[in-house]
Amino acid sequence: MNNQEAINALQMVRQANPLVHNITNVVVTNFTANGLLALGASPVMAYAKEEVADMAKIAGALVLNIGTLNPTEVEAMIIAGKAANEAGVPVIFDPVGAGATPYRTETARNIASAVQLSVIRGNAAEIANTIGESWTIKGVDAGEGSGDVVSLAKKAAKQLKTVVAITGKEDVVTDGNTTYIIRNGHPLLTKVTGTGCLLTSVIGAFAAVERDVLKAAAAALVIYGVAAEIAAKNAGDEGPGSFQIAFLDALSRVGADEISRYGRIEQGE
């Protein structure tokens, strides 16, 4: 995986305009939809259990996010996930806040067990708690933990039989055998709610067009991080509000030149 492959994947997203079915949380719905539109994908937010299976089957990817979970939506997620599995549609899962409460942790584990995931993306604490490893979490944000994030990602990939993306100061993405480290992004991403959730949906957009889901996830992480760096530069010292707008603009404009110059991806051990 290299910058040119990330560029190629971005071009495929923009040419195909893939439909990404999101069952996500109420905090981030608008930002997620606008971010996908800016990137070049086509978002749909369909939550009713009476239609989620039909929608998932016609989508390019299904994204499940438990940020504001409730029993009705969890049921819809599992229905949609199983329908996507039957149709060969990639399923991307964001176990927001896994480890914060027993119900949230149990829900993350149940979804990961009931649905064959293509990619799971979260911070180290969320991924660790989803697979039963010990890691502290603060609300729905990453807490303090000790341990090797690469080893954690590989263990999760093998246990869940999926690609795992652990995001933080450095991003790690692995299928348990091949691992990539991405060193792009900007601290202002942590000052705007929903940037992690949007990233998960962006991975969905790439997985819809690049069937090698490891490469799809890696490409999404590189491009997302480069866009954040561009946005921070353009926003200057204005703060997170201006950054949020600049970031949507950057997602729509980022291209081959910026990715070639600023993309920082390397293969790990």
Curated annotation (Swiss-Prot):
Gene symbol of the encoding locus: thiM
Family: Belongs to the Thz kinase family.
UniProt cofactor(s): Mg(2+)
Catalysed reactions, as listed in the record: 5-(2-hydroxyethyl)-4-methylthiazole + ATP = 4-methyl-5-(2-phosphooxyethyl)-thiazole + ADP + H(+)
UniProt keyword Acetylation present: no
Keywords: ATP-binding, Kinase, Magnesium, Metal-binding, Nucleotide-binding, Thiamine biosynthesis, Transferase
Positions of substrate binding: 45, 194
Family matches, as Pfam families: HK
Group of enzyme by EC: transferase
GO molecular function, one term: magnesium ion binding
EC number: 2.7.1.50
Residues that, per the record, bind ATP: 121, 167
Organism: Geobacillus sp. (strain WCH70)
Function noted in UniProt: Catalyzes the phosphorylation of the hydroxyl group of 4-methyl-5-beta-hydroxyethylthiazole (THZ).
Any Gene Ontology biological process: thiamine biosynthetic process
Gene3D superfamilies noted in UniProt: 3.40.1190.20
Cross-referenced NCBIfam families: PRK09355.1, thiM
Name of this chain's protein: Hydroxyethylthiazole kinase
Highest taxon listed in the record's lineage: Bacteria
Pathway(s) where this gene product acts: Cofactor biosynthesis; thiamine diphosphate biosynthesis; 4-methyl-5-(2-phosphoethyl)-thiazole from 5-(2-hydroxyethyl)-4-methylthiazole: step 1/1
